[in-house]
Amino acid sequence: MAATDLERFSNAEPEPRSLSLGGHVGFDSLPDQLVSKSVTQGFSFNILCVGETGIGKSTLMNTLFNTTFETEEASHHEECVRLRPQTYDLQESNVQLKLTIVDAVGFGDQINKDESYRPIVDYIDAQFESYLQEELKIRRSLFDYHDTRVHVCLYFITPTGHSLKSLDLVTMKKLDSKVNIIPIIAKADTISKSELHKFKIKIMGELVSNGVQIYQFPTDDEAVAEINAVMNAHLPFAVVGSTEEVKVGNKLVRARQYPWGVVQVENENHCDFVKLREMLIRVNMEDLREQTHSRHYELYRRCKLEEMGFQDSDGDSQPFSLQETYEAKRKEFLSELQRKEEEMRQMFVNKVKETELELKEKERELHEKFEHLKRVHQEEKRKVEEKRRELEEETNAFNRRKAAVEALQSQALHATLQQPLRKDKDKKK
């Protein structure tokens, strides 16, 4: 039998056979086991809030989870955009939720907004990288690992009633391949219903024309397909947030009180808050988590592994095992290491040669300087000797002249003394 036939048979997967059970086995409890394990482990959910300062991000979070999160008030004078994550442990019935709310503080407050999206992208990538590093550990513990990957980005749109700002389009375009984006119109009670309807159509048209991929509620699950399809048509959600309770009729409701009336947060005729809560928390929270892992994180992971040289197949679509990839990378690394060592050795040799040439040049310069100083010294010595000889000659000449002068002075003195004696002799005669 040919080798190709053997490979074909060895790689062929046998068709599974359907068998009937003679009695109860017990694996029908697997869903219950999974639920019990999940409840014991708890869940994590991470929300990124992007929007201008003062647009109502904190208020909406408080309204969504029916609690009050302790948050610092943001200033309008931030020099740059910074991400501020805060984690809370929540419990409803016997389900524990580790909720992380990440606020993009200072977004849209700078004069130069060209790079406003960069800190947000870097933060999302940093959470992906942290999870990837945990996965690549030899001794990893994903069960206990606190997953900080962003599961959903609530993008707060200013209710201008006209169109999206260029900053919004650029930012959402940069984020759509990294996170599930749900656009929402904040403070929807500031514009009329007719303006709001036109604004929604305008926003969706601009998102489509600019190729921005927002999160679509899944319709492949029959249990939620119908409601999700209906809710996809309501995007972006126009929301109003409030933690204040106002008495309407005989009951207290969360609402915003105005001189002209009351806007009820949970009244679907007033805003889309209930739709957002249903879609975000009660229906699609697990899908958002799954999409983050299977789509956005997998894209990041694949790109990172390809950068590291890992791939599933070669150019001929032949599958690579991890061992083959490791060996190929090891050979590549050793070859690169050898090349680097050779380059360093050659650089060292060249450096030694250059240093030797420099030392020889310095030695030659020093020798020339020494010879020059030696000649100067000899010339100075010759001049000194010549001066000394001239001085000795002048000294000898001076001494001779001095002796001659002294002799003349002695003779003159002697003659002067002899003259009076002669005169005395002449007088005596």
Swiss-Prot record:
Subunit structure and binding partners: Septins polymerize into heterooligomeric protein complexes that form filaments, and can associate with cellular membranes, actin filaments and microtubules. GTPase activity is required for filament formation. Interacts with CDK14, SEPTIN4, SEPTIN5 and SEPTIN7. Interacts with VAMP2; the interaction inhibits interaction of VAMP2 with SYP. Interacts with STX1A.
Keyword Phosphoprotein: yes
Modified residues annotated as N-acetylalanine in this record: 2
Record organism: Rhinolophus ferrumequinum
UniProt feature, compositional bias: Basic and acidic residues: 1-16, 376-391
UniProt feature coiled coil, ranges: 322-410
Family: Belongs to the TRAFAC class TrmE-Era-EngA-EngB-Septin-like GTPase superfamily. Septin GTPase family.
Modified residues (Phosphoserine): 10
Septin-type G domain span: 41-307
Binding residue positions for GTP: 51-58, 106, 187-195, 241, 256
Keyword line: Acetylation, Cell projection, Coiled coil, Cytoplasm, Cytoplasmic vesicle, Cytoskeleton, GTP-binding, Membrane, Nucleotide-binding, Phosphoprotein, Synapse
Region named G1 motif: 51-58
Protein name (database record): Septin-8
Broad class of where this protein is predominantly found: cytoplasm
Spans annotated as G3 motif: 103-106
Residue numbers spanned by region G4 motif: 186-189
GO cellular component, one term: synaptic vesicle membrane
Location relative to the cell: Cytoplasm; Cytoplasm, Cytoskeleton; Synapse; Cell projection, Axon
UniProt region (Disordered), positions on chain: 1-22, 376-398
Role summary: Filament-forming cytoskeletal GTPase. May play a role in platelet secretion. Seems to participate in the process of SNARE complex formation in synaptic vesicles.
Single GO MF annotation: GTP binding
Xref: SUPFAM superfamilies: P-loop containing nucleoside triphosphate hydrolases (SSF52540)
